[in-house]
């Protein structure tokens, strides 16, 4: 679709209307999934989807220092989805009569609208590929940029950034496009500079300040990121750092009696209880990721 990137979820059974907010972790995990399926099938549709998703993140959710922001809001001018919807008149005005009609027929754009009186461009009723309309998509993307900008949640979370670093490293190995590896390495340097003190990690960065605490997920995903960078570069520094942070995670979070890892270390007095999370929800649990890290190490 126009501008690329995945929204959080669909609000209807037909997958027409998304909740328009876009989260870093969703896009990172989906890049991993698409690259993995491409590796198994060699179907370039999957690699193309992964690359377009990465392009969205690098263009819309990346700080000047190389870290990745947390989310892009759903609302524009107080209306959810307004930034992403079009009228038929807009499409014709922007693309011209002939191109506008072709695009509208393919992408379900009507005078009546397919969503609350306006249109969400979609291919649910069409057999064409969006690549057939790359020129029109770019034109509409640049037209859309003149609208009120979407709010960015500009927190930089180490765990979500680590997911994105791992995804970009995988994407580099699938595509051999150096820009993805460069972005992954830049982000890791940002995290190392701003969210690491020795083997102590900090959860978040905002307004030139880091948080005070860290959790199992921060270590687990950061170790994964370092391992993926090692596999992409064969630079042993990444492997050695992964091993060091793995030992530190064991020291801080391990349940030495019953196995597994607690969410927080014993020095964190802000939590009245210290759960041991094993459920994989919107993101894999820290325990799952640590098990994966141990196997790879």
Regions found by a protein language model. Give the residues of each.
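Glycan-recognition and catalytic cores of secretory/periplasmic carbohydrate-active enzymes
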Residues: 1-297
């Amino acid at each position: 679709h126009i501008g690329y990137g995945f929204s959080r979820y669909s609000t209807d059974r037909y997958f027409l209307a998304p909740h328009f907010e876009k989260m870093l972790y969703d896009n990172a995990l989906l890049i991993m999934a698409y690259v993995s399926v491409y590796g198994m099938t060699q179907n370039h549709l999957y690699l193309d989807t992964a690359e377009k998703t990465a392009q969205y993140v690098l263009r819309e959710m990346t700080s000047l220092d190389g870290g990745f922001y947390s989310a892009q809001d759903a609302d524009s001018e107080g209306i959810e989805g307004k930034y992403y919807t079009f009228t038929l008149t807009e499409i014709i005005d922007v693309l011209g009569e002939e191109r506008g009609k072709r695009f509208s027929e393919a992408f379900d754009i009507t005078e009546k609208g397919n969503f609350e009186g306006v249109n969400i461009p979609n291919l649910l009723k069409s057999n064409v590929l969006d690549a057939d309309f790359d020129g029109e998509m770019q034109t509409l993307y640049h037209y859309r940029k003149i609208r009120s900008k979407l709010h960015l949640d500009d927190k930089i979370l180490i765990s979500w950034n680590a997911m994105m670093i791992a995804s970009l490293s995988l994407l580099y190995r699938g595509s051999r496009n150096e820009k993805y590896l460069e972005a992954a390495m830049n982000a890791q340097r940002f995290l190392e500079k701003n969210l690491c003190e020795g083997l102590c990690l900090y959860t978040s960065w905002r307004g030139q300040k880091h948080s005070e605490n860290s959790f199992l997920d921060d270590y687990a995903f950061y170790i994964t990121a370092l391992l993926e960078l090692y596999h992409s570069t064969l630079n042993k520094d990444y492997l050695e750092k992964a091993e060091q942070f793995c030992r530190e995670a064991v020291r801080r979070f391990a349940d030495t009696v019953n196995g597994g890892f607690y969410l927080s270390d014993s020095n964190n007095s802000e939590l009245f209880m210290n759960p041991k999370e094993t459920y994989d929800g919107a993101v894999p649990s820290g325990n799952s990721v640590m098990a994966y890290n141990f196997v790879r190490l």
